[in-house]
Structure formats: structure tokens, C-alpha cells
Amino acid sequence: MRVMINGFGRIGRTVLRAWLKGGWPGLQITAINDIAPAETCAYLLEYDSVFGPLDGVSLESDTLVVQGHRLPLTHVADISSLDLTGVDLVLECTGKAGTIDVASRGLRAGALRVLISGPSEAAEATLVLGANDHLLRPGMQIISNASCTTNALAPLARLLDEAFGITTGWMTTIHCYTGSQPTVDAPRSTDPARNRAAALSMVPTTTSAGLLLDRVLPDLAGHIDCAAVRVPTASVSAVDLCVLPARPLTAEAVNAVLRAAGGVIGVTEKPLVSSDLRARPESIIMALPETRVTGGGLIRVFGWYDNEWGFSCRMLDMALRISEAPA
């Protein structure tokens, strides 16, 4: 499958870094589009403040050469002006594909399908690996890969619901700051708190994960609500999930279910901190020592997720799944 990356920001660059490490032999990244100059694209790929330097990066005019791969760069705001004939899938990583007009630009340029790295009202389906990816159908052209937090929460919620039933629940994501937040106090968001300096405070705010969870797992719609606290760290976030099960359980029984999960759900028995989970490929890594069950039967589980690296791996995984479904 021939893949183009549109938007070479945090997710676009991390997708490329993850792809270079291998594991997706059926995918061939062939081109990149970003409005930034070629020199900036190359520099930010080579030197990353979170993941460190990347060897083998050079620039030949508007061709990015990375570890032997030659990737032509274009710099247009609207990719419908490009000729994308021969591109099987556009990884839409601009963060701006919420409408059908923007989301379909790759299709109008000749690409066969589009996978969006975030929520979008234009998507024919919002799919999460390990939760509802079985709903992928031939002929789907615009697909949303949901969000990093939804990719962490949805497989976990499905697992727990199938194991013992979820009556109701609450999830708080403890989320590192992102590019949507200012580095100094500035009017950036309709949420007043998100306008405060990202690296100086914990910021209570909203998350799209609750809405997206209802789309991904409609049987749980209205059963789990969500909130977020943005914290002054640069990478790795956490899901703190409390649920009331349909029947009484022990912490040991819950952890047995988590240990047996596999797939995109990892586990750790160690007392780790967020920086220990950097560049982990799983959608979520459950911290088993943090599992609690109250006398009233409420279950609390806690899991880490690298909101950039893990989600980028899911973008590549979903691209591979899409390649198996005829256009």
C-alpha cells in the first residue's frame, strides 16, 4: 500500500519514525505534504525534543532522504491541488480534517482513501484497533482513527465490559500538554483554562474521548463519562478509570483479566513513572499495582499511554487493516 502523510507535525513525524523502526512491511510511505519549508521539516524530524535525534536524515532540494528512503516534499495548504494518482491512502495528520470539504481533499486529488488522525464528522466510521476495527468495510473512503485517549480507553472498556459488565463509570485522562496549548498565557481556546501557560500548571479541561467512546462502543453509550487534566509534562499520558461492575469482583480477578488481554493492551507490575513509558507501542499499558476495588464494589484501574508514539503505531496498524479491505 502506497501511503502519503499530509501534515508533518507531531503525529506525522512520529508516524514516520515508527514506520522506520519496522513492523509494517505492507506499507510504503511515498510522500509528505506540509506547509512548513523543507528545511524545517527535515530539522524537526532529525532533532526531536521527546524522542531524541534520528540518524540518516538529509535534504536534497525538496526530497527528504531518511535512512535510504527518498520522500518527495510538497508544501500546499490544500492537497486537492496535488496529483495523488497512485496513492492508496492519505494519512491525514493536519488536525484540521473535521469537515467533509477538508477530509475529502485527498480523494479529490486522486487518492483512494483517507485515514484521519483525530475525530471528524466527515468520517464514514470511527474505528479503534482492539475495540471496533471489525466494522471496517470494503469501500469505506474516509475513516477516523479516533484520538490517542480513545485508543487507550476503548479497548480497555470493551475488555472490562465483556469480562464482567460495566454499569457506569468515570474516566479522567491525565494528559501531557500538546501544541493546542500556549507556552505563555494567551487567548488560544474557548476553554478559559486552556489559555494558561501549558508548562506551568495542571489544567482541568474537557476531552473528546467520552463522545468518541459512545461512537466506538455504542453498547456503552452514556455509561462512561470523561474529563481531562492537562499536566506540565511533554510526553506520555494516563487513563484513570473507575467503573461499577455488574457483579462483585476482587482486584486480583480484575488484574487476571488485564494480564490475559494481550494485543494493544500491555501490563506492567513495576512502579513506573510516565517517562518510563516513552515510545511504547501499545495503546495502553495497565499499571497492575494501581488496581483497586472498594467495599462498595467500585473498580479503579490505571494505565499509561504514549499519546504520540502509541497512537502513531495505531495509525500504521489501521492503515495495514485498511489495505486488507478492497477500496
Where do the protein language model's features map onto the residues?
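A generic structural signal for alpha-helix starts
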Residues: A97, N151, P248-L249, G310
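N-terminal Rossmann-like NAD(P) cofactor-binding subdomain of oxidoreductases
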Residues: M1-N195, D317, A325-P326
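Structured loop/turn residues at secondary-structure junctions
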Residues: G95, C148, T205, A246, ...
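Short, well-ordered loop/turn and helix-capping segments at boundaries between secondary-structure elements
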Residues: E162, D219, R247, A260, ...
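C-terminal substrate-binding/catalytic lobe of Rossmann-fold NAD(P)-dependent oxidoreductases
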Residues: R17, K21-L82, T167-T168, T173-I299
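NAD(P)-dependent Rossmann-like dehydrogenase/reductase catalytic/cofactor-binding core
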Residues: P281-A327
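Short glycine-rich or small-residue beta-strand-to-loop segments that form or flank ligand, phosphate
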Residues: R2-M4, I143-S144, V239-P245, I299-Y305
